[in-house]
Amino acid sequence: MGAALPEKIGYPLLRSQLITRVTSELMMRTREPAMRRFINNQHAAYFGSFGSRKGVLQAYKVSISATAAEFAPQIQVPVQMLVAEDDDLGTPQTARAMFAALEGRPHSPGERFEMIPEVGHLIHYETPTAAAGLIAEFTHEDFTV
């Protein structure tokens, strides 16, 4: 909608704190008031801080027209995929399919698919300890082939 409207209307819409807040609320799974305030404050501080309307619209178009799965065959290092069980931007089935695309290429021993339960897209806010623990375990493995 921000792209379809004239710039005088579309630009403020893209920077809208109301839209940022609604999006933030829809993506959160936590019920902890302090965490909800923190996430909302982070989104309010950073979501409207893009350089140009054109740039944010280009980024959006790229985000809906390509996926990381397209680049899987080119990845030549072990991969750990952290997936939110209840992510609004992707399903566990889609994530498993993306991970399966990685398994047939060289350097796949030791790779991990990790599902973090009861969390949405905001793993880094809502379950940072669980995510960091999984990453720490993964990075300390011996990946000698």
Task: Give the ranges of each region predicted by the language model.
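Conserved alpha/beta-hydrolase catalytic His-Asp/Glu region
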Residues: 12-74
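Catalytic active-site module of serine/aspartate enzymes centered on a nucleophile-bearing elbow/loop
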Residues: 103-145
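Residue-level signal for the nucleotide or nucleotide-sugar donor/cofactor binding architecture
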Residues: 51, 90, 126
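Short beta-strand/loop motif that positions the catalytic acidic residue
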Residues: 75, 81-83, 87
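Flexible "cap/lid" loop of the alpha/beta hydrolase fold
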Residues: 1-8
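Conserved alpha/beta-hydrolase "acid-adjacent" motif
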Residues: 35, 88-94
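Short, conserved loop/helix-junction motifs that constitute active-site signature segments
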Residues: 72-76, 101-108
